[in-house]
Amino acid sequence: MNKLNILIRFDDICPTMDYSQFKKATDLLDKYNVHPLIGVIPECQDEELLIEEYHSDFWNYIKELEKKGYKIAMHGFNHVYDTKTRGNINCGFKSEFAGHSFIKQYEKIKKGKEILESHNVYTDVFFAPSHSYDDNTLRALSKCGFKYISDGYSKKIIRRYGIKCVPCRTTGVPKIKNKGNYTAVFHAHEWVRSDKAHAYNELENLLKKYSNSIKDFDIFVDQPQGNYAIQNIIEKVTVFYLRYIKSKLSYVKHNVLKP
């Protein structure tokens, strides 16, 4: 592995997504021969993602992307938040998984995997909507045969309940230094919004500047695991900062120290 390794991840891929925006993404990715990790929602019921009419050729489209080298992940089950629980790492009080019993989560994950496999889509990679999951999620993933979750605030891969947690330390494009492992997250359907349109330019700039450091998922995860105790502390400190310190510092900056 190189000193600098970057993974590109796209969330919210489903039959009713904004195909024109996602095509903008795939055109750029193809130009630089980059193969992202894409999160496919097995049975999307999120009203915010019901953007276009259901595309009956969606699953064939996913298989074509897979043939090009895209890595498929399962992104939740229906992408509907039905608990008001934070989970292990996220700041918001909403989740599709965290807070549910092991059995409930196992049933969701098992059914989601069955839907994917009914369309000949097979994967052992998962990530939850809004980065919200808990220990029961990891246990259920392990029982369902998953091996990876693209999430967590450690700096190196660690293993929990048999699942390799591949760090995803931001909800967008991280500040990239000259070494380290980074996951850049994109939501193509949001690019139509004035406050999110810049993300397309961020993708383009990332591809232009770092194309040689962007790795396919299978290569990206081929790295030594970190020391669990150390990485667990790093994650807990980061979560504490994001939940309890960052907002207070922002308040001071904009309301106390403003000119």
Report residues per predicted region:
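Hydrophobic faces of well-ordered beta-strands that scaffold small-molecule active sites
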Residues: 6-10, 36-38, 72-75, 123-126, ...
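A general structural detector for well-ordered alpha-helical segments in enzyme core domains, enriched
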Residues: 21-25, 57-62, 108, 112-115, ...
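C-terminal domain-boundary segment and adjacent tail
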Residues: 33-40, 191-259
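Short, flexible, mixed-charge acidic loops at enzyme active sites
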Residues: 80-92
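Catalytic domains of cell-wall/extracellular-matrix polysaccharide-remodeling enzymes
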Residues: 96-169, 197
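A conserved mid-domain beta-alpha-beta active-site/ligand-binding segment of alpha/beta enzyme cores
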Residues: 160-161, 165-204, 215-222
